[in-house]
Amino acid sequence: MPPSRATTPDGVVLALHDLGGDGPPALLVHATGFHARVLGPLAHSLGTRFHCLALDLRGHGESGVPPNLNFDWAGFGSDVLTAVDAFGLVGAVGVGHSCGGACLLLAEEARPGTFSALYCFEPIVFASGALPAPDPSAPLARKARQRREVFSSRQEAYANYASKPPLDVLHPDVLAAYVEFGFEDLPDGSVRLRCRGQNEALMYEAGLRHTAFSRLDAVKCPVVIACGAESRSFGRADFGPVVKRLANARLEVLPRLGHFGPLEAPSAVADSVIRDLDPRPT
């Protein structure tokens, strides 16, 4: 199904996706560098309990880029609110991965009461009061700028990613969706990443400066902060201050998963979401 479109207050045209399912609405928000369709396998597993909707954040997938390439994460929060309004959601649940989890919190802070509950898997929210200046040499930003963007075909791209870290841990259906919908066709027959490396680097740099942590007390809905027991990015201790600052939150550690948990084991994460957020008896 082709995406619908909605325009943010600052003029970014977003791609919105109906990922299917039956039940109360759930808005799914992807991580930096990915796009809504990689959450398709998660949505499939959630589909017996939730009607899953999603968006491509600015600079990702089929969405446009912001004016002057300003990737301040407040804009991501605005993207979420634009999607909420375009879908006509009232009291939906939100499920976010990494950057997507932070975006849900930013959106709820900006407009309290937007969501009835949130499930945030390793959200990029830091308990530091310091806001470091963007550092172009930071590892994630540097790697994004160096990332190969063009392949001869989607088949070559898939084989490349499946053969080495970090994307070799992704569920095959997730990786297939990442490649199928994350590349655009070029006139010479080759394909190029839609989320350009320079833009992704700017997103990582801006991710060090958002202020979600300082405003967590505005979030009153129930929140589950989930993390992977095998994550090399974050651990239980990193999220303790976030859980403590939220009014109604708890931490859940999922065994055998890393930072890519929702993309590694969509069904396991879906089971966790259903246990935590679905009010209907199992």
Residue ranges and their predicted role:
Residues 254-266:
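Catalytic histidine-centered segment of alpha/beta-hydrolase-like enzymes
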Residues 263-275:
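Post-His helix in hydrolase/transferase enzymes
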Residues 148-206:
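Conserved alpha/beta-hydrolase catalytic His-Asp/Glu region
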